[in-house]
């Protein structure tokens, strides 16, 4: 993943909406910066990192997202997780790279269930 593709999303503490951007840690909390001078404090427990992939609709796929994967009449639903020991994203129990993202659709995330 290129450095310019490293981005995060988290739930804005004030509005409850999800925002994307750069992650900033300050003494008074965690922030997402969307623009050079515009940042918002976020719920640190909801911070998710971008996988570098998009689904078939062009929606960015983040850690914690719930996706539906369809291939050859089979459908599988699962969440995207990070395994620090393998340094890889997982879909269910398998490496994410084994599943073409153009066969996936983001349907939500584990924090909104």
Regions found by a protein language model. Give the residues of each.
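Secondary-structure transition motif
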Residues: 1-113
